[in-house]
């Protein structure tokens, strides 16, 4: 009976813990461009050229970019910098040691960030959209930005 009471008390706390884990920051609504192939291709180009230098997407293969209308030749010519094969995973050449030295922490893998950040406050896309829009210029930081 004692064990049952403890179990019920613990279960009663679950909703409160869930609400506390949500945070309280309001999310902006990301524009839905999931059917706009040119926007998706531009996003892939920006990600590979800027984000993939530090952040891996180790659960995604380059050949998945064909799903947004890119040909294998376009992928090879414009988006493959750390690999020779379109079937390879999107990994970075930055070592964990260098990342910790330069940034203070290893940049997170972004393979499933949109799924992981979905919450009752909004979709994972809303989270990423809000996150990227909150960067600002900060001359006091080594990178010049607040990230």
Residue ranges and their predicted role:
Residues 1-34:
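Post-cleavage N-terminal segment of exported redox proteins
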Residues 21-45, 56-67, 75:
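Electrostatic cytochrome c docking/interface patches
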Residues 33-40, 44, 100-103, 118-125:
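Solvent-exposed, acidic/flexible segments
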Residues 45-57, 96, 106-115, 127-130:
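C-type cytochrome heme c attachment motif
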Residues 56-64, 119-122, 140-141:
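Short, solvent-exposed secondary-structure capping/transition elements
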Residues 60, 116, 134:
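Short loop/turn segments at secondary-structure transitions that flank enzyme active sites
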Residues 65-108, 113:
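Structured domain cores in non-transmembrane regions
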Residues 124-147:
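Extracytoplasmic/lumenal ectodomains and periplasmic regions of secretory and membrane proteins
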